[in-house]
């Protein structure tokens, strides 16, 4: 933390109005002798220290910090000239070294720096015992150099942090340390705040509520992501195809389409996936597991997202609205497909005939006209169809006779 010492001999000329100095030439030598005698006996380097808080120091520009360096060094010389015993703090030695390499920062005098001058006047005659004060913010000491440079740097990835506690938490990414355990399920976390958020899964607490739709969340980051549904904000853009996404995670997963990167392989069928969550969802095809159940109708689903979308068939909720025609949809995917009607985009092309479609299911259905595949079979008469919708229409024939 930075500290400013006001020069004893320079204070009247630099920080007080010139009008107060006129008419004081007589007896000047006597006053100087008295001041010198008094200062020699009473004033030490620490006694006249004026400290900047962390926030005040951050407001100073390089020229103002240069002024501080000059004032500090001048003060040390002034005390020495008065015959006072001066034990150089380590900061003074650092400042003398810095002065040799940062002379290009000079150029602002006290008279041309009114904000800093006002600050110094306000702090004048406020004795401090500790030149170096380690400001505490919420019980955590913040380390800074005298020029405001952050000292909390990770020695593995060189990322810099404003507090030692943030650096300590960050280092656990490299070490894998997770010292905070959940007493209910045993899951471990790298920080206490993550554990606090996790515990809300068990107690059902959701203190963060959306002011648009009333939906509640257990942590503020989930609420921020949710709000982008309402605002339409998609700040993450793919630099290859310019598709935009609401989250960095979605963008990262999308980029693997371009790179062909598939790290996660199914050990049963060998199919590879770009994300672990996609592999987990795929594995349930083999196991038949459907752990997500609808409380209204009892229907089960492989993925929580499928259940969320299904529940909207009961509630009638359609939170995704087209900003061109006003039509609403129960899922963001349905809205994305719908928007292609307006844009005319048809990104899915048949490899046999070149015909293009605006959604994947349409091109899959079309491909069956080439392959002759008819996977949808009527359980009454055994007739097969290329699509589920054709089968549904056909079943009405049988329903008439029931």
From Swiss-Prot:
Its main location: nucleus. It holds the Pfam family zf-C2H2_6. Residues 43-114 form the KRAB domain. The keyword NADP does not apply. Gene3D superfamilies: 6.10.140.140, Classic Zinc Finger. GO terms for molecular function: DNA-binding transcription factor activity, RNA polymerase II-specific; RNA polymerase II transcription regulatory region sequence-specific DNA binding; zinc ion binding. It is found in: Nucleus. InterPro entries: KRAB, KRAB_dom_sf, Znf_C2H2_sf, Znf_C2H2_type. One of its GO terms (cellular component) is nucleus. A zinc finger (C2H2-type) spans 152-174, 180-202, 208-230, 236-258, 264-286, 292-314, 320-342, 348-370, 376-398. Keywords: DNA-binding, Metal-binding, Nucleus, Repeat, Transcription, Transcription regulation, Zinc, Zinc-finger. GO terms for biological process: regulation of transcription by RNA polymerase II. SUPFAM superfamilies: beta-beta-alpha zinc fingers (SSF57667), KRAB domain (Kruppel-associated box) (SSF109640). PROSITE patterns: KRAB, ZINC_FINGER_C2H2_1, ZINC_FINGER_C2H2_2. May be involved in transcriptional regulation. Belongs to the krueppel C2H2-type zinc-finger protein family. This is Zinc finger protein 558. It comes from Homo sapiens. The gene is ZNF558.
């Amino acid at each position: 933390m930075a500290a400013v010492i006001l020069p004893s001999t320079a204070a009247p000329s630099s920080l007080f109005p010139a009008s107060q100095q006129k008419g004081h030439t007589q007896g000047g030598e006597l006053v100087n002798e008295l001041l010198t005698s008094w200062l020699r006996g009473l004033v030490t380097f620490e006694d006249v220290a004026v400290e900047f808080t962390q926030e005040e120091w951050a407001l100073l520009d390089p020229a103002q910090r240069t002024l501080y360096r000059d004032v500090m060094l001048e003060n040390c010389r002034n005390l020495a000239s008065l015959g006072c015993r001066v034990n150089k703090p380590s900061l003074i030695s650092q400042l003398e070294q810095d002065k040799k390499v940062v002379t290009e920062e000079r150029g602002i005098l006290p008279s041309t720096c009114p904000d800093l001058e006002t600050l110094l006047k306000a702090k004048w005659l406020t004795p401090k015992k500790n030149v170096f004060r380690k400001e505490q913010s919420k019980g955590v000491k913040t380390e800074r150099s005298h020029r405001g440079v952050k000292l909390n740097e990770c020695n593995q990835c060189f990322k810099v942090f404003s507090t030692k506690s943030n650096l300590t938490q960050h280092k656990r990414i490299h070490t894998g340390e997770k010292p905070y355990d959940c007493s209910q399920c045993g899951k471990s976390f790298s920080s206490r705040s993550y554990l606090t958020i996790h515990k809300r899964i068990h107690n059902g607490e959701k203190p963060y509520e959306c002011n648009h739709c009333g939906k509640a969340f257990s942590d503020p980051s989930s609420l921020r992501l949710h709000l982008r549904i309402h605002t339409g904000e998609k700040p993450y853009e793919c630099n290859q195809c310019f598709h935009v996404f609401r989250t960095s995670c979605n963008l990262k997963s999308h980029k693997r389409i371009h790179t062909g990167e598939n790290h996660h392989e199914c050990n049963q069928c060998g199919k590879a996936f770009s994300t672990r969550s996609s592999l987990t969802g795929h594995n349930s095809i083999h196991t038949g597991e459907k752990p997500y159940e609808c409380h209204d109708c009892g229907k089960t689903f492989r993925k929580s997202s499928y259940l969320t979308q299904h529940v909207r068939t009961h509630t009638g909720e359609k939170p995704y609205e087209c900003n061109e025609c006003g039509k609403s949809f129960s899922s963001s995917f349905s809205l994305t497909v719908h928007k292609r009607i307006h844009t005319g985009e048809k990104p899915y092309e048949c490899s046999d005939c070149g015909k293009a479609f605006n959604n994947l299911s349409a091109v899959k259905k079309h491909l069956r006209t080439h392959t002759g595949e008819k996977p949808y079979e009527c359980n009454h008469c055994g007739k097969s169809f290329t699509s589920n919708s054709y089968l549904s229409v056909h079943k009405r024939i049988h329903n008439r006779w029931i």
